[in-house]
């Protein structure tokens, strides 16, 4: 089998060790994992040829790589290029050979053009044939692979039903129902049901063989050797369970609790199939987009022998993966997202998959969803569902999962519902027991408390805090706004909206538009003081920092994460952040930065829904739930980001709660729902209620209203954080005791009373509360409505516009502070001081008496004339006309041309004169450190200037080399050393250097076009088919050779000049003594050395004159 060919442009020699590694890889293509030098180029067609199993000659494989890379898409371009090259050949050739004695006649030109066209057509035909053969080989591999998968699929179904019947007799009902629909084979009259003796003996023998095979199923005592690291005992047991399912042809659900290593168990199953069964795939993993990076890393970490491909990206990236990586024989595992599984189903349907693995499988519990329908159309041997969320005992959801796992048995939802139909309340426990019997062969679920004894415990504490004055003001206004709905009980949708607004107020009042003071919007203590939870967080974080803890902060609201981000920057804490808008690469980079050893990141901000899935953040030991989710499982998933395998410390969970508000009821309901879910599974009751009803919402909204209206002052205390935590532990203990009593009481209730289980308080004070009276007592009287007597529009406008009407005195308008950006380089500090002074004075002058208290305030002074003049001067000093777009254009121009090339930068700027740009550049140079991200900006500019400097060095080096020749296009020589290129000849390298000197370094598209249009390379398909990236790499190799040659040449010239000066100043006596010391005893040697020295001097002087 031919080895993959590697082109080496600098060394031009393949080491023997590299060849051995390539032999071991056996043409695995992209999955080999071998590292290559920067100058090495691998021929993908050669690797594809090996994967196809063809044993063609090495030259043919190289030609496939050299010719087919761009010819398929650019065939018309090739034809037009070839047609254009032929007529223009005579002109260019005559110009380049003006001094030659031989002149080609017209007849010879015509013959040559005709011969070139024939050769070109022949080459194109051969190219098409080679492309056709390549596609045929790939299709043959795909057909062979799919046929093997289909054969296994037919074999695996034979013993499946028998295995299921051994587990429970329930499957006999569904099997009979299915078999009854099938057509019975025609028999032999009344003897049709009887078997012959030979058939009976054959069946008995087969049953005995199956029994022996079943009794001797595979059970691993140690993990497969291809799995790196050490698997725990329960993980090995999970692998054996998955192997048993595989051997019996059964699909399954791996439902271990979050953090127990479901990903590792799944990867170990694929490793087992690879090592022991010789099954390399293809397998497909479908997971949430946010977890794809983690899947790839885990596969590379635990089972590097598997070749994994991440199928994700924009259309161009997906097209590259589809054509180069997602090919038969080039990958083992395809990892993709739910969205890609739907969007790219045409591509993925080509394959027959060995395993389809669905992570976070609760997404397919609705059989009518697009994802569920799409996953059912893929052809696969096995399906494995992974979920950390416990399954609810809902009949239809369970049928949907069973239908996905075993569609040929659980084909009808009606039959399933009829079989499990409940005739009375006493039968419910029996029905659920039967359901669990059905699920038992497919489902494996284990809890941390049962299997992971070495995992440190998790302790949850509810920290209650009061509200600030601003929070109370907004909370009270929200209740007054929807008085009718809250008092009488309106629609559930309106109540949900009120509940959401109240929860926003509990989190931070700045979530409401206009609540934050500004503009200008500044980060200061007001960010902390105006929200009770922020005061609590500000006390908690320093304590956690002192004891070297690391913190995860979860919130449901992305805008709240913005506020927390401002706070962390204000306090100087280093942090990472992930929410629903974070891209995949940024997400992986943030997780890696937080988890790396010695990381200085103290806080990780995450949204509960986007950041609570598939992330391992076990390096943190504190979880702060800034707000609680309606679904308690979401909060549990968030906690398990830290409380999982690899955690070495006790995990502390702090759940923030605003006292006497809706949040207390939300948390209480979450605790009740967790207890009730456990009770449902224990008692065998069918879970029906999933959403909060209208009555529950009404009670939550009304809760704490009396406390809010009774006082307008802040209820935030100055207690020490240790005291707050101690009180929180007491509160949590009380709530746990209440939940225990709730569970005991709930056991006595019937299923009809399930809705009332959430309301177990004997004294429902919020129902007894006269909410309307409470609000009316604290009502702020709105202004009186004024009834207009005149209803005529014309008369109204006449009166309104009458000249003699007395005009009301208008109150002076409070000036608005302009939004000042950091790139405009204003003196923000001084301007803010002047504006605040002016605004305070005007507000005091126009403010009416408030009813809260009538204390006399100190009289404020307006701006003096000097201060007013100073303010106007400061506004003129900045660059108010420069927008963010202008600033970004200026930065890009600095990166492109350098900071000193003002003329080129000004040419890039639209609407700015050169003088304006020069003034801005001067200020930017002096005050760039005032920018918020100046480090990144300066690094980018310096990187661009370094590229410019390097480009100038390269052009000087090439110019210096070319200046040593009269006609470098014909005479240029390159000192390759020992390793000369095998595929790029000297003529090609000479043309490349001359064209780069003419076109400029970096213009690779123009260089590629020059190669294609040049008659010198009309039939050199290797050169004409090179991409711009390959030409750039070759050019870089030649530049390094030229720079090395220039350095040696400069050294020789310096040595020649030094020897010449020494010879000029040396006397005859010294010369003879030097000759004796150097061993020049014979006159002939002395004569030869002098002659060589003179020749070197002559050549050096001639070169300098030409230079």
Swiss-Prot record:
Residues 1-124, 177-217, 1049-1107 are annotated as: Disordered. The keyword GTP-binding does not apply. Residues 183-193 have a biased composition (Basic residues). Keywords: ATP-binding, Chromatin regulator, Coiled coil, Helicase, Hydrolase, Nucleotide-binding, Nucleus, Repeat. GO terms for molecular function: ATP binding; chromatin binding; DNA binding; helicase activity; hydrolase activity; nucleosome array spacer activity; nucleosome binding. Residues 877-929, 978-1039 form the SANT domain. Gene3D superfamilies: Homeodomain-like (1.10.10.60), iswi atpase (1.20.5.1190), ISWI, HAND domain (1.10.1040.30), P-loop containing nucleotide triphosphate hydrolases (3.40.50.300), Tandem AAA-ATPase domain (3.40.50.10810). A motif (DEAH box) lies at residues 359-362. GO terms for cellular component: chromatin; nucleus. Residues 121-147, 1029-1067 form a coiled coil. Belongs to the SNF2/RAD54 helicase family. ISWI subfamily. This is Probable chromatin-remodeling complex ATPase chain. It comes from Oryza sativa subsp. japonica (Rice).
């Amino acid at each position: 089998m031919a080895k993959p060919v590697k082109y080496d442009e600098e060394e031009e020699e393949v080491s023997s060790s590299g060849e051995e590694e390539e032999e071991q890889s056996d043409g695995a293509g992209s999955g080999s994992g071998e590292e290559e030098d920067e100058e090495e180029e691998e021929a993908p067609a050669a690797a594809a040829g090996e994967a196809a199993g063809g044993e063609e000659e090495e030259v043919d494989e190289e030609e496939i790589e050299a010719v087919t890379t761009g010819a398929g898409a650019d065939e018309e371009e090739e034809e037009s290029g070839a047609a254009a090259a032929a007529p223009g050949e005579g002109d260019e050739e005559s110009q380049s050979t003006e001094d030659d004695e031989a002149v080609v006649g017209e007849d010879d030109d015509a013959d040559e053009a005709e011969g070139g066209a024939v050769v070109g057509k022949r080459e194109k035909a051969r190219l098409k044939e080679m492309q056709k053969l390549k596609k045929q080989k790939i299709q043959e591999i795909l057909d062979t692979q799919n046929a093997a998968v289909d054969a296994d699929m037919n074999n695996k179904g034979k013993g499946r039903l028998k295995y299921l019947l051994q587990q429970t007799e329930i499957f006999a009902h569904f099997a009979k129902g299915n078999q009854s629909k099938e057509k019975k084979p025609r028999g032999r009259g009344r003897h049709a049901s009887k078997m012959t003796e030979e058939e009976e003996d054959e069946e008995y023998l087969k049953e005995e063989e199956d029994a022996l095979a079943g009794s001797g199923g595979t059970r691993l005592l140690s993990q497969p050797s291809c799995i790196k690291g050490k698997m725990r005992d329960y993980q090995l047991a999970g692998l054996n369970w998955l192997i048993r399912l595989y051997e019996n042809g059964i699909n399954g659900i791996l439902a271990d609790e979050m953090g127990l290593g479901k990903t590792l168990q799944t990867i170990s199953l694929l490793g087992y199939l690879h090592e022991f069964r010789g099954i390399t795939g293809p397998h497909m993993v479908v997971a949430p987009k946010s977890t794809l990076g983690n899947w790839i890393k885990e596969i590379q970490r635990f089972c590097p022998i598997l070749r994994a491909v991440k199928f994700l990206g924009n259309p161009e990236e997906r097209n590259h993966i589809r054509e180069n990586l997602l090919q038969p024989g080039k990958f083992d595992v395809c990892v993709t997202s739910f969205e890609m599984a739907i969007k790219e189903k045409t591509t993925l349907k080509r394959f027959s998959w060995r395993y389809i693995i669905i992570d976070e499988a609760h997404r397919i519990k609705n059989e009518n969803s697009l994802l569920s329908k799409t996953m059912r159309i893929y052809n696969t041997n096995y399906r494995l569902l992974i979920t950390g969320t416990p399954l609810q005992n809902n009949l239809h959801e369970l049928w949907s999962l069973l239908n996905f796992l075993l569609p040929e048995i659980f084909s009808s939802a009606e039959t399933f519902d009829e079989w499990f139909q409940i005739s009375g309340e006493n039968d419910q426990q029996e029905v659920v027991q039967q359901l669990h019997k059905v699920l038992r062969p497919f489902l494996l679920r284990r809890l941390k408390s049962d299997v992971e004894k070495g995992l440190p415990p998790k302790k949850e504490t509810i920290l209650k805090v009061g509200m600030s004055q601003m929070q109370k003001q907004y909370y009270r206004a929200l209740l007054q706004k929807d008085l009718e709905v809250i008092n009488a009980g309106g629609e559930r949708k309106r109540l949900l909206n009120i509940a959401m607004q109240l929860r926003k107020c509990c989190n931070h009042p700045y979530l409401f538009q206009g609540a934050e003071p500004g503009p200008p919007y500044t980060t200061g203590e007001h960010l902390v003081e105006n929200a009770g939870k922020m005061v609590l967080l500000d006390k908690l974080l320093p304590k956690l920092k002192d004891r070297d803890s690391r913190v995860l902060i979860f919130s449901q609201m992305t805008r709240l994460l913005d506020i927390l981000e401002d706070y962390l920057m204000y306090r100087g804490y280093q942090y990472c952040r992930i929410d629903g808008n974070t891209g995949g690469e940024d997400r992986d980079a943030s997780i890696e930065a937080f988890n790396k050893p010695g990381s200085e990141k103290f806080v990780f901000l995450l949204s509960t829904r986007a950041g609570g899935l598939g992330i391992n953040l076990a390096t943190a030991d504190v979880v702060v739930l800034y707000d609680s989710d309606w679904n308690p499982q979401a909060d549990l998933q968030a906690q398990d980001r830290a409380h999982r395998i690899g955690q070495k410390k006790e995990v502390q969970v702090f759940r923030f709660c605003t006292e006497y508000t809706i949040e207390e009821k939300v948390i209480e309901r979450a605790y009740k729902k967790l207890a009730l879910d456990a009770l449902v599974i224990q008692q065998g009751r069918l879970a029906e209620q999933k959403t909060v009803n209208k009555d529950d919402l009404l009670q939550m909204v009304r809760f704490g209203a009396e406390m809010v209206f009774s006082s307008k002052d802040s209820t935030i205390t100055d207690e020490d954080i240790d005291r707050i935590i101690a009180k929180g532990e007491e509160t949590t203990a009380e709530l746990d005791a209440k939940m225990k009593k709730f569970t005991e009481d709930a056991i006595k209730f019937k299923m009809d009373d399930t809705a009332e289980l959430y309301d177990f308080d004997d004294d429902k004070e919020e129902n007894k509360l006269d909410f309307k009276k409470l609000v009316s007592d604290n009502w702020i009287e709105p202004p009186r409505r004024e009834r207009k007597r005149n209803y005529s529009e014309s008369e109204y406008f006449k009166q309104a516009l009458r000249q003699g009407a007395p005009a009301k005195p208008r109150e002076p308008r409070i000036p608005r502070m302009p939004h000042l950006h950091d790139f405009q380089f204003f003196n923000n500090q001084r301007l803010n001081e002047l504006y605040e002074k002016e605004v305070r004075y005007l507000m005091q002058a126009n403010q009416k008496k408030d009813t809260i208290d009538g204390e006399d305030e100190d009289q404020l002074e307006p701006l003096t004339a000097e201060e007013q003049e100073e303010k106007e001067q400061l506004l003129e000093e900045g660059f108010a006309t420069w927008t963010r777009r202008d600033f970004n254009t200026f930065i890009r121009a600095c990166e492109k041309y350098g900071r000193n090339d003002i003329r080129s930068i000004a040419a890039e700027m639209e609407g700015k004169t050169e003088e304006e740009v020069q003034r801005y550049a001067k200020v930017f140079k002096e005050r760039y450190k005032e920018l918020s991200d100046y480090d990144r900006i300066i690094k980018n500019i310096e990187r661009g200037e370094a590229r410019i400097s390097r480009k100038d060095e390269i052009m000087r080096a090439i110019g210096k080399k070319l200046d040593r020749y009269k006609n470098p296009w014909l005479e240029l020589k390159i000192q390759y050393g020992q390793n000369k290129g095998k595929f790029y000849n000297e003529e090609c390298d000479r043309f490349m250097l001359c064209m780069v000197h003419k076109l400029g370094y970096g213009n690779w598209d123009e260089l590629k076009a020059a190669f294609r249009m040049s008659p010198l390379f009309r039939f050199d398909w290797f050169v004409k088919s090179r991409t711009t990236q390959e030409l750039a790499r070759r050019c870089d190799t030649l530049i390094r050779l030229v720079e090395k040659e220039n350095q040696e040449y400069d050294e020789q010239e310096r040595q020649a000049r030094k020897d010449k000066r020494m010879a000029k100043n040396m006397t005859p006596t010294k010369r003879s003594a030097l000759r004796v010391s150097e061993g020049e005893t014979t006159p002939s040697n002395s004569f030869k050395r002098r002659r060589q020295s003179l020749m070197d001097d002559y050549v050096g002087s001639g070169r300098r004159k030409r230079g």
